[in-house]
Amino acid sequence: MKRIIACGVWIIFAMMLLIIADLKYARAQTPEAAPDFAMEDLQGVNHRLSDYRGQVVVINFWASWCAECIVELPSLGALFDKYKGRGLMVLGITTDRKRESVEPLLKQSRVRYPVLLNTAGSALLKQYRIIGLPSTVVIDKNGFIVERSAGRMDFDSSAFTGKINRLLDSAKRK
């Protein structure tokens, strides 16, 4: 009986890995408009996604208790610093409810992109189909989701920066 239960657990685990692997670097099959939202950052400045139309937007969903999330903060910050002058916006959306949980990590990691407190709660996570943290969504200049990723990413990788360069170089659709 224990063997059957153990086998069942392994099958479920393997299925979850396949689902996550399928989401990793997944491109949207048909253009999907990114749901608009408005949230305040840690300094109280309001950000609306639609305000960034015409720019490539990388949204990173994370939390202070998520070790993998914290590991990717420096490479995400480097991506922002490298491309912000070319039309890239990075928005970090934390699931933490309190600024005090987040601010020390951001200071330590020297994060300079806006970090928003997810006041919309699970509704926003559902709209963006976020199933785990960290998760990253890339939105093109026209406001369409072009990539979704679950799990830690290396934003310094040539594969990712190549995609960002192609998106930045592409003309905005009318």
Each predicted region: which residue ranges?
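Positively charged n-region of N-terminal signal peptides that target proteins for export
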Residues: 1-6
